[in-house]
C-alpha cells in the first residue's frame, strides 16, 4: 500500500467522510441547545475551525444563516464548493481562530470535535475566547467540545473506526505518541487507510494538541470574564443526560453563554 506522510487536513474529501458519522446527532444537539439555553430564538450559527463545513451545511439546509472559518484553505475551498453545488450562499473564510472578527454577531457558535486544542499556547487560547466573545451576541451560546486529560483515571490511548460512502472506505486509527504534562503537549498519530476500486493508499499524520485538565479548562474559560458555563455534556450529545465534570472526565461539551458584563476577580 502506498504511504503518504501528509496532513489529513489537506485531504478534505476523506476527512469529511471520516468525521461525518455523527453529523445528524451533532446537528440535533446544536439545535437543541439553542432552543433550551439561548436567551432568544437562534437564527445565525458560526463554527470556528469548521473544516469541510459538514455541520454548517446541515444547518443551512434547515434554513439557518451560517458562517465558518478555518486555517486550512483546502478545507474552506471544499466547504464552499459544497454550498455552491447546492446553490446556497456561503461565508466560510480562511482565518486564525485565535484572532478574527465576524462581520455580524452570531446567536450560537460551536466547535464540537476537539479542534480548539490545536491552539498551541495559553495566549492563543485566551485570544480565541476573546475573539469568540466578539463574535457571539450577549446571551448567545458557544458549544465547545474538548477532550480533557483526566487526573484520576487512565487516559484513553487510542481508537479506531471505519466510514464508507459508495465504493470509498476509510479506516481510521489514532494512537498516543507522547504526553508531556509539564509542557501541556500531547502528540497523537493518525492514519487513514483509504480503499477504492482503483487501489488503496495510506495517509499518516501526527496531531500536536495542547492538553487541558478539568481545572485548567475552567480557569481558561473564567479568565476572560465573558463566559459562564451553563451546562456540560459528554460526546453522546444527549440533552436529557447532562454530566458533572470531574477529575475522571475526558470527552466534555461545555455549553457557554455570553455574559452581558465582564466578571473580574476570578
Predicted feature residues:
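Conserved SAM-binding loop of SAM-dependent methyltransferases across substrates and taxa
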Residues: 52-64
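Conserved SAM-binding strand-loop segment of SAM-dependent methyltransferases
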Residues: 85-97
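Conserved beta-strand signature within the Rossmann-like core of class I S-adenosyl-L-methionine
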Residues: 139-146
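SAM-dependent methyltransferase
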Residues: 146-219
Amino acid at each position: 500500500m502506498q504511504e503518504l506522510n501528509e496532513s489529513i487536513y489537506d485531504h478534505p474529501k476523506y476527512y469529511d467522510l471520516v468525521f461525518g458519522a455523527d453529523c445528524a446527532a451533532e446537528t440535533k444537539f446544536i439545535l437543541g441547545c439553542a432552543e433550551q439555553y439561548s436567551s432568544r430564538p437562534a437564527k445565525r450559527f458560526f463554527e470556528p475551525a469548521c473544516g469541510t463545513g459538514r455541520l454548517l451545511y446541515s444547518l443551512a439546509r434547515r434554513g439557518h444563516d451560517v458562517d465558518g472559518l478555518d486555517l486550512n484553505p483546502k478545507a474552506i475551498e471544499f466547504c464552499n464548493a459544497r454550498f455552491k453545488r447546492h446553490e446556497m450562499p456561503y461565508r466560510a473564510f480562511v482565518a486564525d481562530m485565535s484572532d478574527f472578527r465576524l462581520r455580524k454577531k452570531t446567536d450560537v457558535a460551536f466547535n464540537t470535535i476537539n479542534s480548539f486544542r490545536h491552539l498551541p499556547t495559553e495566549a492563543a487560547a485566551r485570544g480565541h475566547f476573546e475573539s469568540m466573545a466578539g463574535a457571539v451576541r450577549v446571551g448567545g451560546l458557544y458549544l465547545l467540545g474538548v477532550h480533557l486529560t483526566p487526573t484520576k483515571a487512565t487516559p484513553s490511548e487510542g481508537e479506531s473506526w471505519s466510514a464508507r460512502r459508495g465504493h470509498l472506505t476509510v479506516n481510521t486509527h489514532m494512537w498516543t505518541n507522547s504526553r508531556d504534562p509539564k509542557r501541556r503537549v500531547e502528540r497523537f498519530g493518525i492514519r487513514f487507510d483509504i480503499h477504492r476500486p482503483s487501489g488503496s493508499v495510506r495517509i499518516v499524520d501526527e496531531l500536536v494538541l495542547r492538553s487541558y485538565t478539568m481545572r485548567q479548562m475552567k480557569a481558561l474559560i473564567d479568565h476572560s470574564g465573558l463566559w459562564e458555563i451553563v451546562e456540560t455534556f459528554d460526546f453522546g450529545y444527549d440533552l436529557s443526560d447532562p454530566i458533572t465534570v470531574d477529575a475522571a472526565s475526558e470527552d466534555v461539551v461545555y455549553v457557554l453563554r455570553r455574559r452581558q458584563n465582564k466578571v473580574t476577580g476570578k
